[in-house]
Amino acid sequence: ALTSLPVATTVGNHAADNANYKYHFYVPNLNNLGDNDIVGGDYYFTYGDVLFMMLNTQDTNSAEHIQFIEKTVAKNANCKWKVVTLHQDIYGSAEHSNEPEIVNLRYALTPTFEKYGVDDVLTGHDHAYSRSKFL
């Protein structure tokens, strides 16, 4: 059963306006930056020497996400690997990839990912598989 498995979720467009999300999923280390809508903001957790940062990009304020990443990486400097998840597919090639809010997120967040040594970015929204070069 799903209740016996650990699950790390990222808020998407179908969950963002529904208060039930926060009742079904545990989100540790939740930030308190900005508006953060009904379901909450970005959060993080560590597993071994991996830092997972889950961005609620339903909030398109990139400055808040960047501030969260900066603070989180500083608090977890001992983690060897850094993984970011977000719902919007900012690196994909499907139909949403050229929407203004997706393009803005891509241009704002990519330099931050590079600056803080993010090893992997996992996305969803377009329901299409794509990947970058081998890292």
Which residue stretches match the model-derived regions?
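Active-site-proximal segments of metal-dependent phosphoesterases and phosphodiesterases across multiple
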Residues: C79-V121
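Extended active-site neighborhood of metal-dependent phosphoesterases/phosphodiesterases
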Residues: A1-N78, P100-E101, A108, S130-L135
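Active-site neighborhood of phospho(di)ester-bond hydrolases with catalytic His/Asp-centered motifs
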Residues: P6-N13, N56, V83-H87, F113-S130
